[in-house]
Amino acid sequence: MSVHINAPEGAIAESVLLPGDPLRAKFIAENFLEDVVCYNEVRGMYGFTGTYKGKKISVQGTGMGIPSISIYANELIQSYGVKNLIRVGTCGGYSEKVKVRDLIIAMSASTDSNLNLVRFQGRTFAPTASFELLKPAYDIAVEKGFDPKVGSIYSSDVFYGDDDEDWKKWAKFGCLGVEMEAAALYTIAAKFGVNALALLTVSDHFVTGEVTSAEERQLTFTNMMEVALDTIAKIEN
C-alpha cells in the first residue's frame, strides 16, 4: 500500500498501462482484460489488474500533468516493483506529418517544466523512451497497419497558454505533438532503471484546427491500447 494507491502486495503486475483518464483505465480493463480486479479507487483514480493473452497486466489512471503522473509512477515503481510503464494517452498535433487519430510513438520528450532543471541543478537532461519497449511497439503497430509516427514530442505544464504562436517553434524543431506527462515518466523510469514508453493518439491539431469529442477520447482510440497490450505480451514471452 502506498499513499495514493490502496493495493495490497502482489496486486499490481510488473507491466502497467498508464492512461491519464481513469475512465479510460476502466474502458481498457472492461474491453481488453480478463479476470479483472479493481485494486484502487483512491481519489477516483482507478487501477485494475487482469490478464491479456495469458499475461498479468495492470492499468492505472494517472490524472493530468507532470506532478500527477510523477506521483503514480514513483509509487508504482518504489512500492509495487513495476518494471514496464506504458502511457496511453492523447496529444495535440504540431506537425503536418501527423493527422488527427494517428498513433505517435514518443521517442523523446522536451518540456517547459522545471522538474529536471531543479533535479540536475540547472543542467539539461534528455528524457527518452526505453528501446526495449519502443522497438516491439513500433513493430507491432506496423504489423497491424497503424502507420505509427515515431519522433519527439513536447510535454507542457500549461494547457491554456498565453502565446498562441509558441507551438510553431516546437514544430519547427521536429516535435510531432504536445501532451503533459511523458517527460516526467521517462525521467522517473531512467532514475529507477525501469522501462517506459508513451503511445499517443492525436486528438486535436494545431495546424488544421480539427478536434475530437470528450466521448471519443474516452471510448475509442483503441489502436494505442492494442499496441501497448501486445507489446507487454511480447516482451513477457
UniProtKB/Swiss-Prot annotation:
The keyword ATP-binding does not apply. Its EC number is 2.4.2.1. One of its GO terms (cellular component) is cytosol. Pfam families: PNP_UDP_1. A purine D-ribonucleoside binds at residues 4, 179-181, 203-204. PROSITE patterns: PNP_UDP_1. Catalyzes the reversible phosphorolytic breakdown of the N-glycosidic bond in the beta-(deoxy)ribonucleoside molecules, with the formation of the corresponding free purine bases and pentose-1-phosphate. HAMAP family: Pur_nucleosid_phosp. Belongs to the PNP/UDP phosphorylase family. This is Purine nucleoside phosphorylase DeoD-type. The gene is deoD.
